[in-house]
Amino acid sequence: MLIVEGVRIAEELENLPKEVRIFDTTLRDGEQTPGISFTKEQKLMIARQLAKLGVASIEAGFPAVSQGEFEAVKAIAREGLGPEIVALARANKRDIDKALDADVDAIHVFIAASDIHLKYKLRMTREEALRRAVEAVEYAKSHGVTVEFSPEDGTRADLNYLYTMVEAVVDAGADRVDIPDTVGVMTPTRMKYLIKFILPAAKGRIVSVHCHNDFGLAVANSIAGIEAGARQAHVTVNGIGERAGNAALEEVVAALEFLLNVRTGVNTKLLYETSLLVSKITGIPIPPNKPIVGENVFSHESGIHVHGVINNPFTYEPIQPEMVGQRRRIVLGKHSGRHGVEYALKTLGYPTDPDVVLRVLDEVKRLGDMGIRVTEDKLREIVEKVLEERERAKEAATS
């Protein structure tokens, strides 16, 4: 459903794909969030939810990291969930063998491409890294699995070298090539340029984007890459991940589906449910103002806004909350107006006589000025008091 009426920019994006694969890496890159470590049971719970959600790929983990990680990845692979199950591996036979032993459908092979990583982390020349990348892809492909390749820190690599590496691994048999913005330094304009530059090297294979959020641009960069022709996005639920996190699954999917009319295969009505599950398991709360899944996203307090939303929700909401599994909330406070109170009273089954509405509104504003939040229970208390006082006044008038 395209919800931007009157805007046809998407139709002018000649490289915009009609469908995009959602590659979820919550269980791998998301688990690299400082302080987060999933048990096998927790990984299985999240994997089942991701399958229910409808992602194309689930990166279940990095089998070479530990025996527990290996067992968790293997358990997920044996669940028969539906999505492609992927394991991460460095560009060496040991890691690839471990991934193969985990019975996964695909192996995500990576090696550094930027000079800073090659010099200070791997202590390796460009030529050596290129040779290892090609050998690793050939080795993995020889075992009959799907292979995705990532030139780590690709957005800081020399462009010509990056092009050469992508072309070489594609010639070696890579099925997909992912471009990682490892430290989140891209901007949407630069990401579009980079993806357009790399596409010829991929020779028709799927190009993917993997964006980190160090400057708050992970989602924007992911969308920009897709607008330029990338056909897959790496994401995590709630945007969890190391440092500032990754591109948030719920935000990328919603933007693609509702702003660009690009199909993702994801059941958007399960986005909120999925977000809550991951938040509960990780212990990381969802910020109230987080796009798509935050509590405030479909909440309204301002009298002008509430009046508009009651008459037509699209006055102050870009999509219906039910489209992402959310619900609308009318919040009462000092910014509230008569229509908001009337709506709240009607929702709770109370009379909406003008005198009751105005007296409740006065009390709501008084409490708001004191910094007191009017919860549903507090509102009931206020209404009951107003109704009680009205009855006493009636009795006094007739006595």
Curated annotation (Swiss-Prot):
Its EC number is 2.3.3.13. CDD domains: DRE_TIM_IPMS. GO terms for molecular function: 2-isopropylmalate synthase activity; metal ion binding. Residues 20-272 form the Pyruvate carboxyltransferase domain. Its cofactor is a divalent metal cation. Keywords: Amino-acid biosynthesis, Branched-chain amino acid biosynthesis, Leucine biosynthesis, Metal-binding, Transferase. Homodimer. Catalyzes the condensation of the acetyl group of acetyl-CoA with 3-methyl-2-oxobutanoate (2-oxoisovalerate) to form 3-carboxy-3-hydroxy-4-methylpentanoate (2-isopropylmalate). Belongs to the alpha-IPM synthase/homocitrate synthase family. This is Probable 2-isopropylmalate synthase.
